[in-house]
A protein has these predicted regions:
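Phosphate/anion-contacting hairpin/loop surfaces
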Residues: 43-225
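A structured, charge-rich N-terminal accessory region that forms the first stable segment of a protein
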Residues: 6-67, 71
Length: 225
């Protein structure tokens, strides 16, 4: 099962329940597009993997012991400077899509509490890990996106963070029988699972196929749970 918006939403809620309020004790970057946060919460250590690999982007706890480079990458060094000993405020999915925000309360060089946000975007070859400050300004990212690479959205230190372009789809949280039926009708004469995928944000074909087998009321429950 791919990590679509539905799966990611369940994962985010589970992760938030375990590590919200926890302290970040260690940060490593075993691969170019993967970060591991060691979070201490409720007397338990959790290793949280955030991976922006184009082929296998994902978010989950792990017990794996990764091999890390002798010299930490620049992005990892910045994350350590900005996030070490910070407190996790929340892990949340944005708009039912495959975007995760991890909000962290930390202390800057002046001793003031500041907000930092670590963003995981799971978007195939456009997947990314991005760190922003409390005003939404990009501090750095695993992958920089220049104007030459994209005229729609750039990802560079110093620029304001812009979310991925939106789609005219239902947020799973807002799904009910009435609006789901309206969107399915709007999708036209296509198989039901394709209509669901085209109507609800973050839905993959495998998830849509499973949901299409259920009555509408049960489908609404699964989507908006």
């Amino acid at each position: 099962m791919p990590m679509d918006g539905l799966t990611l939403g369940f994962a985010a809620r589970e992760i938030n329940a375990r590590i919200a309020g926890g302290r970040i004790d260690k940060i490593t970057q075993p691969e170019k597009d993967a970060i591991v946060l060691l979070v201490r919460a409720e007397s338990t250590n959790y290793k949280l993997l955030l991976c922006a690999s184009p082929n296998n982007a994902r978010l989950h706890f792990t017990n794996q012991n990764f091999s890390n480079p002798l010299e930490p990458p620049m992005f990892c060094m910045l994350l350590r400077k900005q996030l070490m000993s910070g407190r996790v405020l929340a892990v949340k999915q944005i708009g039912g899509d495959r975007v995760i925000h991890i909000d962290i309360d930390t202390v800057d060089e002046m001793g003031d509490h500041v907000l930092r946000r670590l963003i995981l975007e799971i978007m195939g070859r456009h997947s990314n890990l991005i760190l922003t400050d409390g005003e939404g300004r990009i501090l750095d990212a695993a992958r920089h996106v220049s104007l030459d690479m994209s005229r729609v959205r750039q990802v560079q230190p110093g620029l304001p963070y812009l979310p991925p372009p939106g789609q005219d789809k239902l947020d799973p949280v807002d799904v009910n029988e009435q609006n789901l039926l309206e969107y399915l009708t709007r999708a036209g004469d296509v198989p039901l699972h394709k209509a669901i995928a085209a109507s609800v944000s973050g839905m993959s074909m495998p998830s849509s196929k499973e949901i299409s087998l259920a009555p509408v009321r049960m489908s609404v429950f699964w989507i908006s749970a």
